[in-house]
Amino acid sequence: MSHTRWYILLGLGLASTSVMVYALQYLTFHNAHDTIFYMLQDLAFVPVQVLLVMLLLDKLLQKKEKESLLNKMNMTIGVFFSEVGTGLISLFVETEKNVSALRSELAISTGWSAKRFDEGQRFIRDFTPDVTIDPAMLGRMKEYLLARRSDLLQLLENPNLLEHDKFTDLLWAVFHLTDELQHRASFDGLPESDLNHLKGDTARAYRLIVGEWLQYMKHLKTNYPYLYSIAVRTNPFNPDAQIEVTG
């Protein structure tokens, strides 16, 4: 109500100012013909001015809306990595045969530049997980994911993620892996074909989560240095990472 009243007062004030200016022009020059001429000339450009203002405002509103949506999405992504993602990456890393290259490329630090993040993303685009799984690891992943199943369901229901196809793909991959593991009472004595199937599901989720993790780290580095600091100190790719600040 207060906003509406403010707009009405603003409109009346601007209209009154226009009337006063034209009245002043007439009183000064005593030429009604020219006053009406210029008034109509100004009115002729009003539709064009309105169009330009509308286009500009629409552009600004779209930009603001996009920024707001991205901020909400990144908050949701942050919840995922805090509650599920970081721990899951730690398990995936244990299955990776070529773990040394992965750790070398993704040992993020507070000194990483935008260029270094881009190099990391290029590495991930060419990265193909080479995982080794056994009944013990499958059991650990099953226990970990089932304990966080409700968190995954809530994330899938979040409407803010509809515009983020890659992260949605990641959630579906993790959720599918969870379902596959849940429906197996035991992992002992599984045929080689079934182990290969689970290996493929693990590799799919693994590859997607690594890419989203690095993209999220870049976001934190740019916008939230204090959150990036703790992410560096809990980096699942760095076996020497420690939460305590030592220097």
Predicted features by range, described:
Residues 63-151:
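Membrane-proximal, non-transmembrane interface segments of integral membrane proteins
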